[in-house]
Amino acid sequence: MKRSALAGMLLALVLVAACGRGQATARTTVRFWGLGREGEVVRELVPEFEKRHPEIHVEVQQIPFTAAHEKLLTAYVGDATPDAAQLGNTWVPEFVSLRALEPLDARIARSAVVRGDSFPGVWDTNVIDGKTWGLPWYVDTRLLFYRTDLVAATGAHWPPRSWGEWREAMVRIKQRGGRGRFAILLPIDEYEQPVIFGLQNGAGLLAGGGRHGAFRDPRFRQAMAFYLDLYTSGLAPGLDRQSIANLYQQFAEGYFAMVITGPWNLGEFRNRLPPEMQDRWATAPLPPPEEGMPYPGASLAGGSSLVLFRRARASEAAWQWLQYLAEPAQQARFYQLSGDLPARPSAWRLAGLAADPRAASFLVQLEHVAPTPKVPEWERIATRVAECAEQVMRGGRDLDAALAALDADVDRILEKRRWLLDRSAEETERRP
């Protein structure tokens, strides 16, 4: 009898242990790919999520930014995409065109994610063909970093409310600085500046639903002319990124008084400028083309979004993870870990950013940002824009000829897109 009771107890213990092991192995694993440093620090947010959701385990794979695009495409071709990932905003259209992503509208409608608690232009980067394909995770945009002492010495109206006021301030800075000194640094091989000026001036960049280039549009031509005048007038040096020896040292030495750059340089300026320079720099939103236009002028809607892959094996659990990352408290914590600006304005208050005057300029600017054209070919087109500007600046072509050639190049890049769109339209017309 005792042996029978003992055997029964042992059997019960074995069954309990087996059940425990079964419960442990029953956890759902979410495979998440993070890019660059974000892929490292996001791991710090996993323990709290798993504490809330003990049935879910998050497996984070960090991928270097330099290899991320190719790795994501390779994973798509090989049917090996993760459940969810971080995706640069300009990459979203490409993966939508591949049918690699799941639209999120139905999920968002049932969740605590609030579209109103976002920067409209940033949210819009994820909306393609009327559907939402990603949740903004962190944001960036570009505005002015400037030397307060050099600007104040000119007596110019600041911050400028138009391109004209801005140029007048730059002329005064150049006059005071003399030979070998410049008002602004604008690396000639960057596409962002001419595109920003074009968007501010109402240029669409592409026409026909993204079928053709529209860089000969008078609004873009005017923007490009303003941009190139900064070089021909000697207000900006004709340097590309490789020719800039040390941006922070040259800024401190007064080689240039201002630069258009992004939030990553908030930390860099604090860390790399000498102590005596720390009270001599500030940030300001970009001016619009004309006084009386909405202030500030538009800038680019950058950053990264959180996407769910169509072939996700654990889509429900992955959506729980993405919602968690989008919470204001987690975005504020992620800012503390990474320095990336939160995509939800409510998180700025939690992170203390709204009280920082240098960061506050970004808060103002982010309410006035616009996405680049939502076509998979955009990055190739952007490279052509920078090449076009450099050709004109170096005297290789006049502006009108360069813009005509740019439109021709862009039309060639978009040839396959035109064919696909036209074919889709024909098939739609043939349907009964």
Segments and roles (model prediction):
Residues E48-S118, A152-R161, Q250, G254-M258, ...:
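Extracytoplasmic "Venus flytrap"/periplasmic binding protein-like
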Residues T74, P82-D83, S111-L150, F182-A183, ...:
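A structural signal for short loop-to-beta-strand junctions that line the ligand-binding cleft
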Residues T125, W281-L286, Y335-E387, Q391, ...:
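Long, aromatic- and glycine/proline-rich binding clefts that accommodate carbohydrate-like moieties
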Residues D129-W137, R142, R167-G213, F256:
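Extracytoplasmic/periplasmic solute-binding protein
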Residues A169-R172, G210-D240, L286-P289:
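Glycine-centered hinge/linker elements that transmit conformational signals in sensory
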